[in-house]
A protein has these predicted regions:
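Conserved glycine-rich Rossmann-like NAD(P)H-binding loop of the short-chain dehydrogenase/reductase
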Residues: 26-42
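Residue(s) in the substrate-gating loop at a strand-loop-helix junction
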Residues: 137
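C-terminal helical subdomain
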Residues: 177, 193-220
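Conserved mid-core segment of classical short-chain dehydrogenase/reductases
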Residues: 87-103, 146
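Rossmann-fold cofactor-recognition segment
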Residues: 49-66
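Active-site helix of classical SDR
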Residues: 117, 153
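Conserved glycine-rich cofactor-binding loop
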Residues: 12-14
Length: 220
């Protein structure tokens, strides 16, 4: 039984939960983190009973930057793998007219994830091991009128992950960039997605698990 631990940030998302299942099935213990951990109680029980692993729940808010260092230090143990599934899409038209909404999108997709990963990157570097998995998006590959605020925030996170990977490459720390396209999740419920090229959360979760095991740098 593999007793390594995986921390999943933004654990309430569909992709995060699917990813958790793949690691749990392989025997990894889980640390599930989200803003409202009460909604994770049922998942904790399910994982523990189904996979015979240890699961702990932790309150985490990506936008509360000042709390990130405390969060990292308060975990029962430093995880071996961290998956960041934090993110927010919003509506482009509303984001264009409301700077506070736009700021929330940018902070949720870039500033918050980059902040918490910076803290754990230093801890992993000191230990000499670990894997950081950041879920970005192909929307960050090119600016488009219909989603450039969301896309630009993801572009920033993609570049951050690339630089972090280069920095830590010789330090025993692996950084994975995940770039999903269309995925049928709660976040895309209000969007009409092209069925032929739309993935399911399980496809992404499996790809993340395989990337960690095979030490793949970039996953589409």
């Amino acid at each position: 039984m593999n007793k390594e631990t995986v921390l999943i940030l933004g654990a309430r998302s569909d992709i995060a939960m699917s990813t958790a299942h793949f690691f749990a099935k392989a025997g990894y213990d889980l640390q599930l983190a989200a803003r409202n951990i009460n909604t994770l109680d049922q998942y904790k029980s399910n994982f523990e009973q189904k996979y015979q692993i240890n699961v702990t729940l932790h309150e985490f808010d990506a936008l509360k930057i000042n709390s990130h260092k405390y969060f990292a230090n308060s975990l029962p143990e430093l995880p071996n793998i961290i998956v960041c599934a934090v993110g927010c899409m919003g509506e482009q038209k509303k984001n264009e007219q409301d700077i506070e909404l736009a700021s929330n999108i940018i902070r949720s997709n870039f500033e918050g994830p980059a902040s918490i990963f910076s803290i754990f990157a230093n801890l992993f570097e000191q230990r000499g091991s670990g894997t950081l998995v950041g879920i970005s998006s192909v929307a960050g590959e090119r600016g488009r009128a219909k989603n450039y605020i969301y896309g630009s925030s993801k572009a920033g996170f993609t570049v951050f992950l690339s630089g972090l990977r280069n920095r830590l490459a010789m330090r025993g720390v692996h950084v994975v960039t995940v770039l999903p396209g269309f995925v049928a999740t709660k976040m895309t419920d209000n969007i009409q997605l092209p069925k032929k090229i739309t993935a399911q959360p399980d496809h992404v979760g499996k790809a993340i698990f395989n990337a960690v095991k095979k030490k793949t740098n970039i996953v589409y």
